[in-house]
C-alpha cells in the first residue's frame, strides 16, 4: 500500500482534457498579441531588430503559406524540399515561435490559476527577482556542510523535447509542427549551453525556448522533488506561500496552528530535509549537512537516474563536491556579483508560542543584498558610458539617433538597473550609477548638437533629468494600485520583480 501511494505521489498531474491548440496557429490575432506583449513587457533584454520587420501583411502571408502546406505528412528529412522554407526562414520561424509560445502557455496558465485558487496562496505586493534571497541561506546557513554543483543535463536529441511536451500538450498537429521547425532551424549544441545562452535568448525568441528548456528541466526535477518530500515524517505545508521568508510572524502564526493541535507529533515537523536543491543559471546546486560519502552516493544516483530514465548526458566528473565553508563568504556561484554584495545580519524577534506561556527571543539570519559599485562601473566602462574610474563620457555610436531615441535608451538602462536592484537594502551605489548614466546621456546629446554640457543643460532645463525618475515611478504604479491609504513611502520600499531573467551588460542595442 505504501509503495502504491508513493507511485501516485510521484505521478505528475497530467489528468487534463486534451488541448487542441493547432487551429490557433492560423489566427492572426495570436501573432499580434505575441508581438505587442514582447514590446510592453518589462525585461532586461532588448527586442533586437524585429520591430521594423513586423507587419500584419507578413503575418497574413505566413498564415497563407502555412495553409498551403500539409504539415501532417511532412517529415524532417524532406523539409528542405518544402517551398515554405525557401523564403524568409528566420523571420517566419521567429514569428511562428512567438505565436506558438503564446498558444502553448494557455493550458499552463489555466493550471496555474486553478492551483493558486485551490491552495489559497496569500497575495503579496512584494515580488521576487533573480537577485532575491535563497531560502536555505537564512535559517540553515551555519549548519550546512557540503555543496555540490553541476550543469543541468540536456537532452541528447531534439525529439526528447517534443516527447516531454506530449505529456502536457496533447495535440499531435501542434507537436508535429513544432518538431518540423526544431529540426529545420535549430542545432542542439546551441540550445542549452550556459556560455551562449544569454546571446541566444537575445537573438531568438527567448520565451519560446525558455519554455522548452523549463519543460525539460521540470521532468528531470520531478523525481528529485518526490524524493525530497519523503524525508519528512509528516506532510508539511511548505513555506512557498510566503514570498519572502523574512516574514517571521507569518511563519510563527502558521506554526502555532500546527503546534496547538498535537504537541508530540508536531515535534517531528521540525525535521529538516536531507538536502537542499537550487536550480540557477543552468546549474543544479545541492547543499546538505550529510557526510561526504552520502553526497557521493547521491551524486552517482542522480547520474544513473538521468542517463537511464531520462536518456540525457550527465558527466560525473563535472559534478563538484566541496565543503560549504568555502562558499559561505563567496556567493559568485549563486549569481551575486561578489562576496561583498551579500551581508549576513542577525534579527531578534520576540514571540509568544502559546497563550499565557513563556516569551522567547528567536534569532534568525537575514541576508541583505547590496549594490556592488565596482563591477557595475566596469560594465558601464565596457559599454563606453564612462571610463575605468567612473567618469561619464559620451557615447559616439548613439549620436546619430534622434534625441528622443537617445534619451529612451538611457532611461531604459536606468529602469533595468532599478528593477534588478530594487530589492537591495542600500542603494547609494545605484544612485551613483544613475548619475553616471544621466551625465553620459547629456554629453551624448551635447556631442550630437555640437554644444557644451553646460549650455545644453541650460537650454534644456531640468526636464531631461526628470525623465530618469518619472519612468521608474510609472512602472511601480503598474504594480501597486494607487489608493489614498497607500502612502508614497511604499513605492520607495524594497520590491522584487518576477519578470527579470538575466542582466546582459546592461543593454543590448548594438
UniProtKB/Swiss-Prot annotation:
Check the record and name the InterPro entries matching this protein.
Domain_X (IPR024937), Maturase_MatK (IPR002866), Maturase_MatK_N (IPR024942)
What is a single molecular function from GO for this protein? Answer: RNA binding
Where found? Plastid, Chloroplast
Q: Which residues form the signal peptide?
A: none
- Any one GO BP annotation for this protein: tRNA processing
Q: What is its main location?
A: plastid
Q: Which UniProt keywords apply?
A: Chloroplast, mRNA processing, Plastid, RNA-binding, tRNA processing
So which domain of life are we looking at?
Answer: Eukaryota
Report if keyword Membrane is assigned. Answer: no
> Can you quote a single GO CC term?
chloroplast
| Keyword match Transit peptide | no
PANTHER family from the xrefs? Answer: MATURASE K (PTHR34811:SF1)
Family affiliation = Belongs to the intron maturase 2 family. MatK subfamily.
What function does the entry list? Usually encoded in the trnK tRNA gene intron. Probably assists in splicing its own and other chloroplast group II introns.
Q: What is the recorded name of this protein?
A: Maturase K
Amino acid at each position: 500500500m505504501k509503495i502504491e501511494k508513493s507511485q501516485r505521489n510521484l505521478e505528475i498531474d497530467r489528468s487534463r482534457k486534451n488541448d487542441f491548440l493547432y487551429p490557433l496557429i492560423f489566427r492572426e490575432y495570436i501573432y499580434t498579441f505575441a508581438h505587442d506583449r514582447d514590446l510592453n513587457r518589462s525585461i532586461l533584454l532588448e527586442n533586437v531588430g524585429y520591430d521594423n520587420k513586423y507587419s500584419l501583411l507578413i503575418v497574413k502571408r505566413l498564415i497563407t503559406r502555412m495553409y498551403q502546406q500539409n504539415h501532417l505528412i511532412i517529415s524532417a528529412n524532406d523539409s528542405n524540399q518544402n517551398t515554405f522554407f525557401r523564403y524568409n526562414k528566420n523571420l517566419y520561424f521567429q514569428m511562428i515561435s512567438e505565436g506558438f509560445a503564446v498558444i502553448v502557455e494557455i493550458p499552463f496558465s489555466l493550471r496555474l490559476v486553478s492551483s493558486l485558487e485551490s491552495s489559497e496562496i496569500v497575495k503579496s505586493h512584494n515580488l521576487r527577482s533573480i537577485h532575491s534571497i535563497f531560502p536555505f541561506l537564512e535559517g540553515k546557513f551555519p549548519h550546512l556542510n557540503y555543496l555540490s554543483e553541476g550543469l543541468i543535463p540536456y537532452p541528447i536529441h531534439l525529439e526528447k523535447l517534443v516527447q516531454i511536451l506530449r505529456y502536457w500538450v496533447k495535440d499531435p498537429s501542434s507537436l508535429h509542427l513544432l518538431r518540423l521547425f526544431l529540426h529545420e532551424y535549430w542545432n542542439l549544441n546551441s540550445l542549452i549551453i550556459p556560455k551562449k545562452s544569454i546571446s541566444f535568448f537575445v537573438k531568438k525568441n527567448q520565451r519560446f525556448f525558455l519554455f522548452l528548456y523549463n519543460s525539460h528541466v521540470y521532468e528531470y526535477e520531478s523525481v528529485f522533488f518526490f524524493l525530497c518530500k519523503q524525508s519528512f515524517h509528516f506532510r508539511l505545508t511548505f513555506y512557498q506561500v510566503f514570498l519572502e521568508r523574512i516574514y517571521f510572524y507569518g511563519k510563527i502564526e502558521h506554526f502555532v496552528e500546527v503546534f496547538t493541535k498535537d504537541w508530540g507529533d508536531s515535534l517531528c515537523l521540525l525535521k529538516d530535509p536531507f538536502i537542499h536543491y537550487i536550480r540557477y543559471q543552468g546549474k543544479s546546486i545541492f547543499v546538505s549537512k550529510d557526510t561526504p560519502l552520502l553526497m557521493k552516493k547521491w551524486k552517482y544516483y542522480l547520474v544513473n537516474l538521468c542517463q537511464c530514465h531520462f536518456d540525457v548526458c550527465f558527466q560525473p566528473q563535472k559534478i563538484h563536491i566541496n565543503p560549504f565553508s568555502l562558499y559561505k563568504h563567496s556567493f559568485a556561484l549563486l549569481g551575486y556579483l561578489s562576496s561583498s554584495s551579500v551581508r549576513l545580519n542577525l534579527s531578534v524577534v520576540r514571540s509568544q508560542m502559546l497563550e499565557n506561556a513563556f516569551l522567547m527571543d528567536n534569532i534568525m539570519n537575514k541576508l541583505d543584498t547590496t549594490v556592488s559599485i565596482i563591477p557595475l562601473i566596469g560594465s558601464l566602462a565596457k559599454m563606453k558610458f564612462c571610463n575605468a574610474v567612473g567618469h561619464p563620457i559620451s557615447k559616439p555610436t548613439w549620436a546619430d539617433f534622434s534625441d528622443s531615441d537617445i534619451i529612451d535608451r538611457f532611461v531604459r538602462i536606468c529602469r533595468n538597473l532599478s528593477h534588478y536592484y530594487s530589492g537591495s537594502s542600500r542603494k547609494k551605489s545605484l544612485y551613483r550609477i544613475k548619475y553616471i548614466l544621466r551625465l553620459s546621456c547629456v554629453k551624448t546629446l551635447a556631442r550630437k548638437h555640437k554644444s557644451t554640457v553646460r549650455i545644453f543643460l541650460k537650454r534644456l532645463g531640468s526636464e531631461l533629468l526628470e525623465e530618469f525618475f518619472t519612468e521608474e515611478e510609472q512602472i511601480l504604479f503598474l504594480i501597486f494600485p494607487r489608493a489614498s491609504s497607500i502612502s508614497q513611502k511604499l513605492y520607495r520600499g524594497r520590491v522584487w520583480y518576477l519578470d527579470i531573467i538575466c542582466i546582459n551588460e546592461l543593454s543590448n542595442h548594438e
